[in-house]
Amino acid sequence: MDLDQNFTLTRLERRFILSFSLIIFLVAGMVISTSTASVSYGQIGDTKVGVFNHTQTDSSGNTTWINSGNWSMSGINSSSPSLTAIIEMAKPNGSAGHEHEINNFKLIGSPVVENQTIHLNGTSTITMRNGPVTSEPTVIALSQEKIDIYFDPENINNHFENQSISGIVN
């Protein structure tokens, strides 16, 4: 009789240990997934691609340039994100078409996250008519659906009329 009681107690203990372990495992999984979500900037993702579709206007609201092109950003959640982009520009009548390449983005400081948008301040290289402009101050605002890239107008002769170039995330 003592043998049967020991076996029954051991069996109950095993069930208790298994149930307790399962509960600990589930709680630990929830804690880990919650902390991972906050680290990766609100689930923005580490790589994004998209297209530009921006209309530049003058101070009166008249369309001066139509901007289009492709962009790609990787390493978003790292200390050295990479931006590659081509911005094609043309007058509203289709004339004066040209393009700019953007690369060599270097992050300055830490990203700032507001309202599920990550803001990255840094510098990049942008090709212009007279050659590449290096260390061009660049601000990127990236969300799940949209990207805005702003270049300091001083070094590029106000080429983008002091406006961000906007696009969408594919």
Predicted feature locations:
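Secretory targeting signatures
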Residues: 1-38
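Solvent-exposed loop and beta-edge segments used for protein-protein assembly and interaction
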Residues: 43-46, 77-79, 114-116, 132, ...
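Generic recognition of long tandem-repeat/solenoid scaffolds
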Residues: 45, 50, 85, 120-122, ...
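Predominantly extracellular/secreted and cell-surface proteins with exposed
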Residues: 64-129
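Extracytosolic low-complexity repeat regions of secreted or lipid-anchored proteins
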Residues: 121-128, 133-154
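C-terminal partner/receptor-binding element of secreted or periplasmic proteins
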Residues: 144-170
